[in-house]
């Protein structure tokens, strides 16, 4: 169980920025289209 947080924390640290980047790029695309 000690290894789970070790893997889970960096995973979230990578997934969260990825989602933020994706939503940001979507907003930029929408602004360019409009």
Curated annotation (Swiss-Prot):
Function: May help in the organization of the PsaL subunit.
Pfam families reported in the protein's UniProt record: PSI_8
Protein family according to the UniProt entry: Belongs to the PsaI family.
Listed name of the protein: Photosystem I reaction center subunit VIII
NADP listed as a keyword: no
NCBIfam families, alphabetized: PS_I_psaI
Keywords: Chloroplast, Membrane, Photosynthesis, Photosystem I, Plastid, Thylakoid, Transmembrane, Transmembrane helix
Protein's cellular compartments: Plastid, Chloroplast thylakoid membrane
Predominant subcellular localization, coarse grouping: plastid
Domain of life: Eukaryota
Gene from which this protein is expressed: psaI
BP GO terms, sorted: photosynthesis
HAMAP family found in the cross-reference section: PSI_PsaI (MF_00431)
The keyword Membrane appears for this protein: yes
Membrane topology: Single-pass membrane protein
GO cellular component, one term: photosystem I
Species of origin: Oenothera elata subsp. hookeri
Transmembrane region(s): 4-24
């Amino acid at each position: 169980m000690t290894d789970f947080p070790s893997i889970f924390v960096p995973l979230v640290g990578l997934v969260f920025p990825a989602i933020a980047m994706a939503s940001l790029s979507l907003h930029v695309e929408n602004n360019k289209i409009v």
